[in-house]
Amino acid sequence: MASSKLLKERIESIQDTMKITNAMYLISSSKLRKARQNYQNVLPYFTRMRDTISRVVPHLPDEPEHPFFHERDLENPKRAYIVLTADKGMAGAYNQNLLKFLREHADQNDRFYVIGQVGYRALFRKDPRLVEDFHYGATAPTLQRARDITVDAIDDFKSGKLDEIYIVYTKIQNALTSEPVMERLLPLDRAHLTPAPKGLGDPRGEVEMFPDAWTVFEQTAPIYMHGMIFGAMTESFCAEQSARMTAMDSATKSAKDMIHDLDLEYNRSRQGSITQEITEIIGGAAAVQNQE
C-alpha cells in the first residue's frame, strides 16, 4: 500500500487535472454556441443563393456546357480533397477518425489540401499526397477564409490542374454522434441544383436575367461554393467542440472516480498508520510497566 503522503500528492495532482478538463469543457461549450450562432446568422443568405442558382440552372444552354458542370471523362482523374481537421487535440478520436476515413477513400495519386494544424502535422513529410504550401487554420471559421479556399479551388479546376475536388469533414448527426463525410465541390452536380418541375402559374417558373443566365450563374456559383466550404468548416468546428466537450466530460468523470478510489485508499492508509501508532504506544507502555 502506498504511503499516505504519496496518496495525498496523487489526489492533489488529479484534482488539478480535473480543474483543467472541466475548464476545457466549459470553453468548448462556449465556442460551440458561438459557432452555431455564427452559422445560423449566414445560413439564410446561402440558402437564398442556392435557391437563386436553382432558378438559373434550367436556363443555362446545354451547349456549350459551363466549365463548373464539365465532368472530364478520364481514366485517372486528378482528384483533390479539402480536408477539415482541428487545430488542437484532446478531442477524442475526432482527428483520427477523419484521417482514417480520408485514407480509406483516397487513391495513391490524389492530393490532400488540409485545413487544421493536427491534420497537417500528421501528414507533413509522411504522406506525399499532402500539398504542403496549402496551410489554413481551422479555429473560428470565417467567410474570408472560405472565399480564399474557394478561389484557389476554382482556379485549379478551371486550369485543368484538378479534375475533381471534394470536401472531407465531420458532420454532426445528432446531439451525441458525428461522423466523417465526403461531398463533391467541383464539378457541380447539375441535377442536384435543378429544382423539381413547378406547376403552371408558379411565380418561380419564369425568371428574367440580365444580361443572361450564363453571366448570372458565373457570378453566383462561386458564392454558392463559398457557402458549401464555410458550412463544412463551421460544422466541422462545431463537431470538434462537441467531441472535445465529450472527451473532457469523460476525463472529468474519470478523475472524480479516481479521486474517490484514492480517498478510500488514503483513509485506509491513515487508519492503518494510526492503528500501528496506537499499537506501538500500547506496546511501549506495557514494556515500561513490565520493567517497573
Predicted regions located by residue number:
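C-terminal beta-strand-loop-alpha-helix "lid" module of Rossmann-like NAD(P)-dependent dehydrogenases
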Residues: M1-E292
